């Protein structure tokens, strides 16, 4: 279910303050955040945001086609190791 248009996109206030501070100083270091629920705004384009995935901070470089998506979509929380192989099939 999509968010109502009249409400606008959700961005955590502390993340927005960090982005404004980085834009003012033109710092190239990644912005560390735990806010996976924040929507990517056009102001974020060109910045690197380190999004927490539950264990580490994954650096995400924000490009133009990411606008409107959530930060958590680009920082995967689960690692897929593959399905267990059938031992009988390997012997043949």
From Swiss-Prot:
Entries under Gene3D superfamilies matching the protein: 30s Ribosomal Protein S19, Chain A (3.30.860.10)
Entry keyword annotation includes RNA-binding: yes
Residue intervals passing through the bilayer: none
A Gene Ontology molecular function term of the record: rRNA binding
GO cellular component, one term: small ribosomal subunit
Keywords: Ribonucleoprotein, Ribosomal protein, RNA-binding, rRNA-binding
SUPFAM superfamilies per UniProt: Ribosomal protein S19 (SSF54570)
InterPro entries in the record: Ribosomal_uS19, Ribosomal_uS19_bac-type, Ribosomal_uS19_CS, Ribosomal_uS19_SF
Keyword Glycoprotein: no
Cysteines joined through disulfide linkages: none
Domain of life: Bacteria
GO biological process: ribosomal small subunit assembly; translation
Job description of the protein: Protein S19 forms a complex with S13 that binds strongly to the 16S ribosomal RNA.
Family: Belongs to the universal ribosomal protein uS19 family.
Name of protein: Small ribosomal subunit protein uS19
Species annotation: Chromobacterium violaceum (strain ATCC 12472 / DSM 30191 / JCM 1249 / CCUG 213 / NBRC 12614 / NCIMB 9131 / NCTC 9757 / MK)
